[in-house]
Curated annotation (Swiss-Prot):
Pfam families: HCS_D2 (PF22617), HMGL-like (PF00682), LeuA_dimer (PF08502). Catalyzes the condensation of the acetyl group of acetyl-CoA with 3-methyl-2-oxobutanoate (2-ketoisovalerate) to form 3-carboxy-3-hydroxy-4-methylpentanoate (2-isopropylmalate). The keyword Transcription does not apply. Mn(2+) binds at residues 15, 201, 203, 237. Keywords: Amino-acid biosynthesis, Branched-chain amino acid biosynthesis, Cytoplasm, Leucine biosynthesis, Manganese, Metal-binding, Transferase. Its cofactor is Mn(2+). This is 2-isopropylmalate synthase.
Length: 504
């Protein structure tokens, strides 16, 4: 093993999916997985195979298609979880089972209701059983950063003796600050030595996930876990793009340490994940935020124009952020379209390619200029599509005075159903029509409109979160030049997601 290489462990498809509204289907996860492979990620946590049949299928499909990356599944320290992980990962060329159990006093007492000795025994049995499926086993001490050091050492020793090759020390609740994690990881690294790779997994509850990850690397950790765009539960995970670019940019601090990440794939990966999940990075997000390379101040603008390095410590080109150039038009053919998709990181089967191309030609008839972001949005809409129980065939809308009206026709069970409604605004009227036609009442929890590219004829992307029949809220996404049609598509998309999850 190269002791200077930092192993990049991406958990966007597992921990990142736990962001509210970020649920992904198998086709979406597969597209992200293939892009993570192009990015140069070392280990990809493809999911939690035991969580549901959908998760099992996603892990299994990724295991079949990934080739130059280690595919990993999370598993609690219970036989059922480990068996599911092992079976889902079976086709993978390189595979890893990541098993875990909580080790902090509060978790052992109140969540597990187990004694420390029982927790150690459970950990050992989990690692040993995992080894029957694959040689590469990672063991995590959940809530390690609130665990007693003496117990951490004891359970890590037991896991290594049982066959674990990686020991992960997560700050599950994002509690520590850099000096604390430096001290803790230094002691663990000194104790473990060369017997296993020490890994860290930091959450961002106090805004220190990236700083803590970098501090842990300096303290001797050689694997770092995180997500693209920093998505994840609560305040999210350590943002891998920040960690990678910090190591690359500050070689005066980190040399001879390095990662195998292909930095020009960072921005395409970020955009793909944002398009699929509907979760946009905050505008001032480091590395991938839309303002990351924007300069408003006149003094800054003057400096950048004279010499970029006056105010830019990394270049936009180094992360693959090229000018959002005009790319294709209505006379472009299928081959040119396919080549453009490949350059943007998409790998579609022939059926999906044909459908995406039809949408592109339709857009080209309506929109004078088509940009990379338009293409990304079109394809993301196609690969995120689920079975359509309800499908819009026509929409008429009007507004003026105190109320707006909407008339809509929707295909359901091979029949066209039409209805109308009034509302406090056009979007409200549209949502009421959908409720009337479907007979399923929804409560709008969130509504967001984004311009995909530039110009007066820019595509509108609408993301909604809707709670149907008092059940868990689901997300819907819509794309159209007409903002209200995009809103209708998003709401109907949420309805279809609800039916797929709760009715089937």
């Amino acid at each position: 093993m190269d002791k200077n290489k930092i192993i990049i462990f991406d958990t966007t498809l597992r921990d990142g999916e736990q962001s509210p509204g970020a649920s992904m289907n198998t086709a979406e996860k597969l597209q992200i997985a293939l892009q993570l492979e192009r990015l140069g990620v070392d280990v990809m946590e493809a999911g939690f195979a035991a969580a549901s049949p959908g998760d099992f299928d996603a892990v299994n499909q990724i295991a079949k298609q990934a080739s130059n990356i280690t595919v990993c599944s999370l598993a609690r320290a219970v036989e059922r979880d480990i068996k599911a992980a092992g079976e889902a990962l079976a086709p993978a060329k390189n595979k890893r089972i990541h098993t875990f159990i909580a080790t902090s006093p509060i978790h052992m007492q109140y969540k597990l209701k187990m004694s420390p000795d029982e927790v150690i025994r459970c950990a050992v049995e989990a690692v040993q059983y995992s080894k029957t499926f694959c040689d590469d086993v990672e063991f995590s001490c959940e809530d390690a950063c609130r665990s007693e050091m003496s117990f951490l050492k004891e359970i890590c020793e037991a896991a290594i003796n049982a066959g674990a090759k990686t020991i992960n020390i997560p700050d599950t609740v994002g509690y520590l600050y850099p000096e604390e994690i430096t001290a803790r990881i230094s002691e663990i690294v000194k104790f473990i030595g060369d017997r296993a790779v020490v890994s860290v997994h930091n959450h961002n509850d106090l805004g220190m996930a990236t700083a803590n990850s970098l501090a842990a690397i300096k303290a001797g950790a050689r694997q770092v876990e995180g997500t693209i765009n920093g998505i994840g539960e609560r305040a999210g995970n350590a943002a891998l793009e920040e960690i990678v670019m910090a190591i690359k940019t500050r070689q005066d601090v980190f040399a001879p340490l390095y990662t195998g990440i292909i930095s020009k794939e960072i921005y395409p990966t970020s955009r793909l994940i944002a398009s699929i999940t509907g979760i946009e990075p905050q505008p001032n997000k480091a590395i991938v935020g839309k303002n990351a390379f924007a300069h408003e101040s006149g003094i800054h603008q003057d400096g950048v124009l004279k010499h970029k390095e006056t105010y830019e410590i990394i270049s936009a080109e180094s992360i693959g952020l090229e000018k959002n150039s005009l790319v294709l038009g209505k006379h472009s053919g299928r081959h040119a379209f396919k080549d453009k998709l490949a350059s943007l990181g998409f790998d579609l089967d022939s059926d999906a390619l044909n459908k995406a191309f039809e949408k592109f030609k339709d857009l080209a008839d309506k929109k004078k200029e088509i940009f990379d972001d338009d293409i990304r949005a079109l394809v993301a809409e196609e690969i995120t599509k689920i079975p359509q129980a309800y499908e819009i065939t026509d929409l008429l809308q009007s507004s003026g005075g105190s109320l707006a009206s909407a008339s809509m026709s929707i295909r359901h069970n091979d029949e066209i159903v039409s209805d109308s409604a009034l509302g406090n605004g056009t979007a409200d009227a549209i949502f009421k029509v959908v409720d009337r036609i479907s007979g399923i009442n929804g409560t709008l929890k969130d509504y967001k409109v984004t311009a995909v590219s530039q110009g007066k004829d820019a595509l509108a992307k609408v993301d909604v979160k809707v709670e149907f029949e008092g059940k868990t809220a689901v997300m819907g996404h819509g794309l159209d030049i007409d903002t209200m049609m995009a809103s209708a598509k998003a709401y109907v998309g949420a309805l279809n997601s609800y039916l797929r999850i709760h009715k089937n």
